C-alpha cells in the first residue's frame, strides 16, 4: 500500500501500511544520502515553501535540505518580516500563498490545527511541521525509522517516553505511531506533566523513573517546554533532574542494549546528563537528525507523486 493522501497533517488516523510505506521509502533515501548520490530531478520545477510561525533550527533546515536534494526550489518565509507580523490573518496568508501556486507547503504554527486550516484553503500539499501541542508527524516518522534501523522492528518493543508529555506534540505523534505498529508505550513524568486522559491512549503511566525504565528497549527523553507551561508545574529544574533526569544509574534500569533518543533541543543537566546524551554506543540522537532528512525527502516524494499521479518508486 502506497501513501496516497494529499497532505501529511497528523499520524493519528494513518493506517499501518501507509506508515510502513513512508518508512520504507525513507530507508531508501537514508541509503542514498549515505552513498553521496542525489535525486535532483524528482522535484525539479516544483516550489517548496517553509512557513514557520515558530522558531526552528533542525526541522526547517531538514526540510530545506530535503527539498534541495530532490531538486525543488525552496523558499523560507520569515514570519517576523512578513505581512503576518503586520496583522495579516492566517486565511489571508493562505490566499496569498495560493496565488503564488507553490506545490508543497511546510507549516509550523503555535496554534493546534493551523496546518489543517491551511490545507483546506490552498492547492498545495501541506505538511505539518508541528502545530501547538497537537502533532509533529515527521518527527515521529524519523524516530520510528531510527528505532527500526537499530532494533530491526517496532512490534513488541517497549518504548519509554520521559518528561514533559503534557506539552509535547512529539510525544503525541509517537504514541499514535508506536501503538499503531505494535510497540508498548510507557509515559514517565510527574503527574503535572502527564495528560489526564493518557490512559485512553493505551499506554502505561509511571511517576517513578526507575520503575518506568525497567526493561525498556528505547528511552526517549523530552525537554521541559517552559514556553508553554503555566507556573508551578515543576518546583525547579534542579529538583526535576533529581527525580526525572536521565543519568547512567537510571539508564541501567533499562535493557543493556536500550537506545537513547531525544527530539531536541536538549537541556543538558535538566532532563538528560551529558555523559548519557553523548554515549557513543547507546545514544542515537545524532542519527535522529540524519534520519530526519531522509524521512522528509520521503514525505516530499510521496506527496509530489500523489499530486502528479505518478507511480511510486524507490530512489536509485
From Swiss-Prot:
Chain sites annotated for binding carbamoyl phosphate: 58-59, 108, 136, 139, 264-265
Regions crossing the membrane: none
GO cellular component terms given for this protein: cytosol
Chemical reaction(s) catalysed: carbamoyl phosphate + L-aspartate = N-carbamoyl-L-aspartate + phosphate + H(+)
Sample GO molecular function, one term: amino acid binding
Keyword GTP-binding: no
Family named by the database record: Belongs to the aspartate/ornithine carbamoyltransferase superfamily. ATCase family.
Identification of the protein by name: Aspartate carbamoyltransferase catalytic subunit
Source organism (scientific name): Granulibacter bethesdensis (strain ATCC BAA-1260 / CGDNIH1)
Gene: pyrB
Amino acid at each position: 500500500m502506497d501513501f496516497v493522501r494529499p497532505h501529511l497533517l497528523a499520524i493519528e488516523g494513518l493506517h499501518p501500511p501507509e506508515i510502513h510505506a513512508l518508512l520504507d521509502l525513507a530507508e531508501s533515501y537514508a541509503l542514498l544520502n549515505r552513498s553521496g548520490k542525489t535525486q535532483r530531478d524528482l522535484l525539479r520545477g516544483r516550489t517548496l515553501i517553509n512557513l514557520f510561525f515558530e522558531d526552528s533550527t533542525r526541522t526547517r533546515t531538514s526540510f530545506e535540505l530535503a527539498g534541495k536534494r530532490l531538486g525543488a526550489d525552496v523558499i523560507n518565509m520569515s514570519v517576523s518580516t512578513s505581512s503576518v507580523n503586520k496583522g495579516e490573518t492566517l486565511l489571508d496568508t493562505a490566499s496569498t500563498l495560493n496565488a503564488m501556486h507553490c506545490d508543497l507547503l511546510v507549516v509550523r504554527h503555535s496554534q493546534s490545527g493551523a496546518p489543517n486550516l491551511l490545507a483546506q484553503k490552498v492547492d498545495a500539499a501541506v505538511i505539518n511541521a508541528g502545530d501547538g501541542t497537537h502533532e509533529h508527524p515527521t518527527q515521529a516518522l524519523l524516530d520510528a525509522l531510527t528505532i527500526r534501523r537499530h532494533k530491526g522492528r517496532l512490534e513488541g518493543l517497549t518504548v519509554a517516553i520521559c518528561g514533559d508529555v503534557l506539552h509535547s506534540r512529539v510525544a503525541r505523534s509517537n504514541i499514535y505511531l508506536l501503538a499503531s505498529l505494535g510497540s508498548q508505550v510507557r509515559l514517565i513524568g510527574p503527574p503535572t506533566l502527564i495528560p489526564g486522559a493518557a490512559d485512553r491512549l493505551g499506554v502505561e503511566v509511571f511517576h517513578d523513573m526507575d520503575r518506568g525504565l525497567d526493561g525498556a528497549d528505547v528511552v526517549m527523553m523530552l525537554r521541559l517546554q517552559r514556553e508553554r507551561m503555566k507556573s508551578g508545574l515543576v518546583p525547579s529544574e534542579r529538583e526535576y533532574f533529581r527525580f526525572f533526569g536521565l543519568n547512567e544509574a537510571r539508564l541501567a534500569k533499562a535493557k543493556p542494549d536500550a537506545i537513547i533518543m531525544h527530539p531536541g533541543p536538549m537541556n543538558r543537566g535538566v532532563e538528560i546528563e551529558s555523559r548519557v546524551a553523548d554515549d557513543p554506543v547507546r545514544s542515537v540522537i545524532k542519527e535522529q537528525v540524519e534520519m530526519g532528512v531522509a524521512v522528509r525527502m520521503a514525505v516530499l516524494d510521496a506527496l509530489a507523486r500523489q499530486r502528479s499521479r505518478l507511480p511510486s518508486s524507490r530512489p536509485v
